[in-house]
Every structure is written in C-alpha cells, then in structure tokens.
C-alpha cells in the first residue's frame, strides 16, 4: 500500500489509465452509482466491441445478476431473545452491498438468531480500502476518518461490542485503522478503539 501511494504521487500514468482509475475511485465506493452502472452495463455489452480493451475487460467482470433483497432494510435489527447478548455494528459495504446483498442479510439473520442486536449505518458507505489500494490516500483518509467518527460516536453514546465485517478486504482495513493513525493526535485514540472492536464474522 505504501508502494501504491508512492507510485501514485511520483509516476505519471498514461492519460487513459488515469481517467480509468479516477472512474473506479469515484464510482465503486458509492453503492447507488455502482448499482446504476451495473444495470447500465447490461445494455452496454451490446456495444462492447466498440470499447477500449480495458473497458471491455471491466464489462466482462460486471455481475450478470443483481440479487433482490429478502430482508427489509432498517437501522436496527433486534435480537431474537429478550435479553441481547451483544450489540454490534455491521459494515454493509459498497460493492458487496450491490453484488451480494444476501451475504449481509444472512449475517444479520445469524447474529439476531443468536441474541445479538445488529445496527447498520448507511452513512458508512465504504471502508476506504478501494481508494487506499488505488493509491488515492487523501480520498481514502476521508473515508477512514468519517467511519471512525461515526462508529466511535455510536460506541460512546449507545455502546458497541464489535464492528462486524463479512468481507475480508474490508475487515483487514478496519483492523489497520489504529496503525494508520498512530501518529495522528486527533484520531489516534479513536482509530485504535475501532480497530480493537473490528471482527470478521468468522471470529
């Protein structure tokens, strides 16, 4: 990741590559925009032969189907027990929210069935890893700080036993928040706590 950031700053990529990477940076972390583009890509495949090679490859990777929701979206999912055993925040993500919403829904069902109250925070769109991996560190840090503030405020006001991720890349990034802000006086304490609370669903 340090290497990507260095390359992004020091190496001038070809114009077409810069445009493509900016496009990814501005669309993938935004679920509504990404969903619209996935739907649009179904029609765009008709004209795929007219597109640049990089765009054709991306069209081939676009999901063939967008799964419908089977669980009504809400901010709080109550535990299926009188006394909840824990209260957690679920990172519903950006790309996964569109491509595989059933993973989040299954996670919620399993947790609530076992007595865990689950909250979702729509304001947390992306963990920041997409821009982080693209070497766009300024945009990534905007997401990191926004998420840290939102979760930390919730932790202080209502309590959180964990922040759950069911996407390995996102989970790794959340656990790195503490390290990323270790020299930031304002965010050091908050980032460390968020990393400590972060758990993969398998944990």
Predicted features, each with a name:
Residues 2-203:
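Iron-sulfur cluster-binding electron-transfer modules in prokaryotic oxidoreductases
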